[in-house]
């Protein structure tokens, strides 16, 4: 599937399932433009709430991840609250993502 088609589907799913105040970013090789065939799709999902709950993964992360199964793409979703992300979860991961992230969806 073409990159634009995958991104359009991700954006539509985000619009359908994510709550108000959410942000979804693409990072990694797909964001930098140096992906190869078979590269995964790295997504960062930030939720505007004080604390993540178990249900958040089933309601928000899982629908984004599983949509890739329908068209043979590996979509990986890393989910944090905005507060957790701004406090810097793991410095190397944080800087890696911040360096090349692209906005896919914000509400």
Predicted regions and their residues:
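Short beta-strand->loop micro-motif that forms the acidic, two-metal-ion catalytic signature
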Residues: 41-46
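Catalytic core of pol beta-like nucleotidyltransferases
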Residues: 1-25, 32-37, 48-107
């Amino acid at each position: 599937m073409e990159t634009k088609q995958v991104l359009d589907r991700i954006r539509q799913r985000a619009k359908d399932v994510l709550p108000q105040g959410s942000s979804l970013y693409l990072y990694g090789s797909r964001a930098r433009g140096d992906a190869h065939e078979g590269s995964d799709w790295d997504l960062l999902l930030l939720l505007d709430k004080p604390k993540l709950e178990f249900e958040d993964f089933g309601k928000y992360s899982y629908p984004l991840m599983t949509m890739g199964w329908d068209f043979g793409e590996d979509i990986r979703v890393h989910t944090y609250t905005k507060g957790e992300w701004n406090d810097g979860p793991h410095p190397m991961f944080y800087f890696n993502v911040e360096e090349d992230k692209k906005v896919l969806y914000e509400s």
